[in-house]
Amino acid sequence: MPILGLKTPGPSHPAHFDLEPLIRPNILALQPYRCARDDYSAGILLDANENAIGSSIPSLANGVASQTLSLLSDSEIASLNRYPSPTHDELKRSIAKLRGVPDEQWVFLGVGSDEVIDMLYRVLCVPGKDRVMTCPPTYGMYKVTANVNDVGVLEVPLITDDGKFQLDEQAAFEAYPDLKMMFICSPGNPTGTLIPLDVIRRVAENPKFNGVIVVDEAYIDFAPEGTSAVKLVNEFANVCVTQTLSKSFGRLGYLVAPPPLIQILTNTKAPYNVSLPTASLATAALSTEGLATMSRAVATLNINRKALIEELKNTKGVGRILGGNNANFVLAEILDSEGKPSNQKAVEVYKTMAESKGVVVRFRGSERGCEGCLRVTVGTEEECKEAVKQLAALL
């Protein structure tokens, strides 16, 4: 069903899904904040009570451009005292082209994907009433944001057989009724495991599930080609995908979703949530040269990931490498003297490495199915070798 007279309603499949009843009534009736800059962006701008004298950044006043500012055009630098574009359509079009959706109407921008996740809660979930589903071990901000918004969380743990992590479809099926959202992290954090697209498709098609599936793909650029759920967004009205430039590009989050949901989010967001420098640098990162640079970086990190896994496997005191290894990190078990995964030993190693060795990793042993685990981000070749060296010395 088109929302607010949308010209591009998006996919109509599955037949049982209707977005409009899911939106909070006050959000559905909301009249979005509008400003003169929505219609006019050039000329003598006396509409927004800005500082017309110019930016107060010292490097600009002294005529010295920093490395970051040097990537901005002269006109962009001259406009730092102005409010940024409320829409950033050029950037959205670049993302749409990169990810394979029709146009900018399918893209919503946020300051990191955490803002996007928070916005989804705010437009879909009634505080004190609605619930969402998460599948631990998973990204902790789903639950934090639910708590902030007074939304209930139903946890359906991933199946953790043999150190692998997959969605428990039967348990999820039994929990479907009355859920507003289901969060699927793929590749997972901290698991690094991809959830197969066929599994997500079955959830989307299930008539018992009337909510929105949110597939968090923060690490998708490190996974094999063709594994992104964005292709499902083109087909299903109840699937959306959060991604971020923070892992393989820079610092920006976005949602790829059918236009009705994008419009609702756009109506609700703060008018100038993404700054001009962020949008300009993100646009540069998505240029032909920027994409080539990103591809080289991802290829290098994937090579380093493979080498790191092999070195960890050959390190005494390190147990299994868990999960799917489709992200820019590795999840490794730390063993005690009896050869069993140990949270106590993992915490000891984690603290000593950070405080005495200058190597900071992440303790993940408190997560379901991750007993005794440290999560090691894939760094440069030298950083990975140093991390393994210091780890081996402590084991």
Tell me the role of every PLM-derived stretch.
Residues F249-G250, N326-N328, R368-G372:
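Short acidic/glycine-enriched loop/turn segments that link adjacent beta-strands
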Residues N302, T315-S356, V378:
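Conserved PLP-binding catalytic core of the aspartate aminotransferase-like
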Residues N238-T315, R320-L322:
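PLP-dependent aminotransferase class I/II
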